[in-house]
């Protein structure tokens, strides 16, 4: 690892620890030439995922785009930034474990709906309204009615109720 101060390539590791939920390793290093201490991060390099949009166009999977959509849906719901990050981590991890590098945008949308419903019913409705392209009040009412009926049937077990809604 090259020293940022003197560009010497030999350094020793002083300390290593896992960070970002185990997705990277943080290393504290010391240059053997000038003694400068610096921090490096090691991350697994993921194979790129190609998202196939509704219109057939392809684009690279963009973690920040997914997070923006989730943040928008979770606005003022009490869902923490950490919970949203973990949700994106889980979805990205699931996509990376697939044998296929191509994924339909609709698959990602369904994954988000299943997970976001566990965090907030309001966030679920907001995300569903954009993802499923609600055209009017009737679409909202139908989804809310199913959500309410299933919530009563499950005696308040919203995650199960919301999960079963994703197949509707």
From Swiss-Prot:
What cofactors does the UniProt entry give for this protein? Answer: Zn(2+)
Q: Does the keyword Chaperone apply?
A: no
Q: Which Pfam families match?
A: ATP-cone, Zn_ribbon_NrdR
Report domain ATP-cone positions: 49-139
The region called Disordered is annotated at: 1-21
Sorted alphabetically, the keyword list is: ATP-binding, DNA-binding, Metal-binding, Nucleotide-binding, Repressor, Transcription, Transcription regulation, Zinc, Zinc-finger
Zn finger regions (unnamed) covering which residues? 3-34
**Looking at the keywords, is Ribosomal protein present?**
no
Amino acid composition bias (Basic and acidic residues), ranges on this chain: 7-20
Disulfide bond positions: none
Q: How is the cofactor bound?
A: Binds 1 zinc ion.
GO MF, any single term? DNA binding
Single GO biological process annotation from the record: negative regulation of DNA-templated transcription
Q: Which InterPro entries does the protein's record reference?
A: ATP-cone_dom, NrdR-like_N, RNR_NrdR-like
Q: Which family does it belong to?
A: Belongs to the NrdR family.
PANTHER family, from UniProt?
TRANSCRIPTIONAL REPRESSOR NRDR
Function text: Negatively regulates transcription of bacterial ribonucleotide reductase nrd genes and operons by binding to NrdR-boxes.
**HAMAP family given for it?**
NrdR (MF_00440)
> What is the name listed in the Swiss-Prot or TrEMBL entry for this protein?
Transcriptional repressor NrdR
């Amino acid at each position: 690892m090259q020293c940022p101060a003197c560009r010497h390539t030999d350094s020793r590791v002083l300390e290593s620890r896992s960070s970002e939920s185990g997705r990277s390793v943080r290393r504290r290093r010391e240059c053997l030439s000038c003694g400068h201490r610096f921090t490096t991060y090691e991350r697994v390099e993921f194979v790129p995922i190609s998202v196939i949009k509704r219109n057939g166009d392809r684009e690279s999977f963009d973690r920040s785009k997914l997070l923006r959509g989730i943040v928008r849906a979770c606005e003022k719901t009490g869902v923490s930034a950490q919970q949203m990050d973990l949700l994106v981590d889980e979805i990205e991890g699931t996509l990376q474990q697939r044998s296929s590098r191509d994924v339909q945008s609709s698959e990602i949308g369904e994954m988000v709906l299943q997970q976001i419903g566990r965090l907030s019913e309001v966030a679920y409705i907001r995300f569903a309204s954009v993802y499923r392209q609600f055209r009017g009040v009737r679409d909202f009412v139908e989804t809310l009615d199913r959500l309410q009926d299933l919530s009563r049937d499950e005696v308040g077990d919203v995650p199960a109720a919301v999960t079963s809604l994703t197949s509707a």
